[in-house]
Amino acid sequence: MADKIDISLYEKARIVVYGDIMLDRYWYGQASRISPEAPIPVVNVDQIEARPGGAANVALNVVALGASVELMGVVGDDQESRELETLLNKKSINCHFHRLNDHPTVTKLRVLGQNQQLLRLDFEKTLKHYEDKGLLQRYQHSLSHAQAVILSDYAKGALFNVTALIQRAREKGLPVLVDPKSVDFSRYAGATLLTPNLKEFEAVVGHCRTDQELESKARALIHQYRFEAILITRGKQGMMLIQKEGAAINLVAHAREVYDVTGAGDTVIAVMAASLAAGGDFYEAAQLANLAAGLVVRKLGAATVTVPELRRALHQITASHHGILSEKALLLAVADARAHGETIVMTNGCFDILHAGHVHYLEAAKAMGHRLIVAVNDDNSVRRLKGKDRPINSLQARMEVLTALRAIDWVVPFSEDTPARLITEVLPNILVKGGDYQPSQIAGGDEVVKNGGKVLTIPIKEGFSTSRLVEKMLN
């Protein structure tokens, strides 16, 4: 598995964004009456705003995460492009525009009444072809110090040469992420990851009645066009991640309130790129992108998400699970805790019948660091270790009791006889067991020490034993 994502590393990432650059205008006002001229609302405009859109909004999302970005694409030689460049420069985005005299900057004007979108006017002309060797040379130069490339395709023509852009980046060993609008996915052959929404995906493969059909058709595209993965965004249904190998992964949507989905796809691909650049794998990146999407749709217009917002959301999710986490969720929480400089302590056991000796031991373990992880043998694992009459309490019951203890931050189940594999994934700063073990006997201890961690033991509180308690109960 790839190194766990430390989102503080976003600020070290350098990302190239190439695509259809737009200017988004917003006219806000009150719509309190119907026009006498036609059955349409009259909006009394009291606020006007301009924001970067399309590929420019992707670049804004990347910068909001703390990463550096170079933005490239085609605009008109007009007031809109100059206004756009001013907005982007204020956000420290390096712009490399190819200006065309006979081509307008794509502009979208949205009219809103009481913050509800009533009308959108598009000012655009699709670009068939353009020649600019200077822009291509600039792109080639930028690849030498980039960690990822985003190609933002809104089907306006800036990516007519997308095959060459993908090829040059892949030759440099860079991941290429594409937000596709074209129904011809062969154009993106060789890209690392595609992030279509469900409508865009079904426009290519046809309607999918089940998740299995969705996965099957995505996997066929992956093999046909040499993609490494496809991430399908599905609105309220969340996301589906399909990779070359392994089963598809469904991620449940996090948004409770949706104000505006404008630009949500831009946020998703920006977080995916930053996460891959920070050393994450597709699943870890998709978890964060899914979380970010849930945050951005609560905002009005094409908005962005920041690292502090992601951190807060991560902590809220951890708290909402009452300490019981899957292995994947645990690794994400640990990475975030490490980014805060926290010391991770880990222990494990069956914890079939919790007693005062356990409480004493766990409180002593927590005192060694900031976060305490308790890995718990699942029922089959306990049965193999303790016999057919154990456990007395089910895995879920044992984990719920453990989470009630103030000393414990996260509880995670494991199915093997020992948690050695899980410990190797987490690599805590301190691995702890009871005093009846020698450090050399502790599963996973060697890997922890190799990583610079410590393996420690805590004296057992005399007079307490789960096995003796069980014997008393049975007799």
Curated annotation (Swiss-Prot):
Assembly behavior: Homodimer.
NCBIfam families: cyt_tran_rel, PRK11316.1, rfaE_dom_I, rfaE_dom_II
Cellular component GO terms held in the UniProt record: cytosol
UniProt protein name: Bifunctional protein HldE
Positions of ATP binding: 197-200
Biological or metabolic pathway of the protein: Nucleotide-sugar biosynthesis; ADP-L-glycero-beta-D-manno-heptose biosynthesis; ADP-L-glycero-beta-D-manno-heptose from D-glycero-beta-D-manno-heptose 7-phosphate: step 1/4; Nucleotide-sugar biosynthesis; ADP-L-glycero-beta-D-manno-heptose biosynthesis; ADP-L-glycero-beta-D-manno-heptose from D-glycero-beta-D-manno-heptose 7-phosphate: step 3/4
PROSITE patterns reported in the protein's UniProt record: PFKB_KINASES_1
A single GO molecular function term of this UniProt record: ATP binding
